[in-house]
């Protein structure tokens, strides 16, 4: 029986060429797998037909938009996950769902190997292969760009020689990855980290310098998940899409950062994540009134570690699973409404309410009706500062000897 290889297929030049390239290099039949995570553009049927036209013996396509929003974006939101304080894990959280469908397709079509289009310098090769090793430990992995010397120039020449049904061009200097959670742009002139990004970089966001009138929005949450916008019920996918539209129109969610890649290099990235950043901002403000102080402090540490694990391709790891359990427990009271104004690149919260809020007006007010017993403060301060006072006395005593 001829060996079969499952290929993560985007519909673009590199993976279209990879179908024939892999076949010629290995003698195997190629099954193309395309997963819709809200990246937009062409329909899955168009992509499926292109894969078959480029030589795939089968084409597996999956509309995973709701799955991605529910099972991958929402855990990211609950964790308030921002890698190195900036990046909302746009690409990192899409790789596990693609891996899941790659392994599923491999089982369905009897493939023994999974192929992806990643280079040897990026994070995604790790995310794909660690995920595949975890979900399908018997499966082998290959990367045509990395392992079979498939360069961009060779891809264009191969496509033209074979007459493949795909546009061949070098005109776009950027590497772009996008889904409903956001958009990532790198390479080209951006590799000089002194160069400012030009307007053509952006697609999800309008120029924040010339915004339309301020847009006030009320986002309702239930156990950490957005369930309504301005009183209209929404699914997680619909919430992200609506805020992509409204926050994007105000230029919210533009991120220009140099980050530490898993492979040991620093890389300049431009991200657009209007919906993600608006939701994370709103969610964090709701947590501020519904999560107890010590729990909130520790959750911030957990969220940072969670983001690092996911960035580093450890979505399916035991530690990440344990952190998920902690984060999920913190969300039981994160229900209520957040009012925010979207304008000029900013998402500013100006109101919050919750039936499970820990904010007590009578304790917090400085006006008549204050129920806070200030007489307790003196004793509390004495006890709170006791250890520092004792240590200071020791320091003075030793210094005087």
UniProtKB/Swiss-Prot annotation:
Q: Which residues bind ATP?
A: 8-16, 117
What pathway, per the record? Amino-acid biosynthesis; L-arginine biosynthesis; L-arginine from L-ornithine and carbamoyl phosphate: step 2/3
Q: What is the first-listed, main subcellular location in coarse terms?
A: cytoplasm
Name the residues that bind L-citrulline: 87, 123, 127, 175, 259, 271
The positions annotated for binding L-aspartate are 119, 123-124
Can you supply one Gene Ontology CC term for this chain's record? cytoplasm
Family affiliation: Belongs to the argininosuccinate synthase family. Type 1 subfamily.
Name this polypeptide is given: Argininosuccinate synthase
**What species is this protein from?**
Paenarthrobacter aurescens (strain TC1)
